[in-house]
Amino acid sequence: MRITELFGRVKHRYLFILAGMLLFLPPLNLIPQTVGETNMCGKVCPRLFLILSTKGIASGALSNVQAMWFGVGLVATVLIITFFFGRLWCSHLCPIGGATELIGRLIPARLKISFAKIDAPAFRYGYFAVFVAGAYWGAGNIACKLCSYRVIPFLAGSPFEPAYAAYLSTSMGMAGLLTVALSGFFAKGGRAYCNCLCPVGAVDGLANYLSSKFGFTKKVRTDPGKCVGCGQCVTTCMVWALKKPEATETVQRDTLSCVSCMECAKSCPAGAIYYGKRQK
C-alpha cells in the first residue's frame, strides 16, 4: 500500500501515535536501544545538534552531527517525507507531540488554555533563533533541560527508573515539566509546544511551506470553490493553522503551522478539505 493510500484510509491517527510512543519511549525504548541509548537524548536527540557550538560554527556543527548522528538522520528522513507528503511525522508518529496530545485529551475542556491569539510562526522562529544561538548566549543548556524530548521520556520512564523521577523533582526538572504541561497537556489541542517551541517543528514547517508551492507534492489543502466559510475547521485545528478573516468568505490555511493531521477534514461539512496535489 502506498503511503498516500495509507494516509487516506486511516480514520484515527492514534494507533500510529501509540506505535511511535512504544518505539521511542520507556519502558520499551526500542529504537533508542538499537543505538545504545536509554532515552531520546544523546545520539538519538533530533534537536540538540541544531544548537551552535562555541567551538566555531563549522567545526561545532560537524561535531554535533557526529555526536548525534541518529537524530540528524531522523530529522533528514522527516524532512524528506514532509517535502513530498506533508508533516506525517508530527501528526502521526512523533512520540512527544503525540503524548502531549493524547494526555491533553484526558483533561477537561474547561481547564484548557487557548494559545490561538499567538502569532505562532513569529513566536516559533523567534524562539528557534534563540535556540540555535543558545550556546553563545548561555541558554543552550536551559533549552535542553526544558526540552519536551527530555521531559516526556523522563516522565514515561520515571516509574521504572528512579533517576528519572529524581530529576523531575529538581527545580530544573519541575520547570521543564511545567513548560510541557502548560504548552502541551493543558493547551487546547495539546500541541502548543509543537507549534511554538519545537525546533524540529520549525524546520519541518519550513519544508512543508516551501514544498507546498510545487504542484507534484501532496499536502492537506482547502478547495476554495467548496469552502462555505462556516469556520468549523478553525475550531478543530490543534495548531490554529486555519483562520477565517472577516474580509474573505473562505478559510485560509497557514502551511508553516499545519501538521497534516486531517482533523479539519473530519469536521468540514462541505468536503472542502482534501489531501493531495494542488488543484489547477
Task: Cite the ranges covered by each PLM segment.
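Non-ligating segments of multi-cofactor redox enzymes
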Residues: 1-251, 256-280
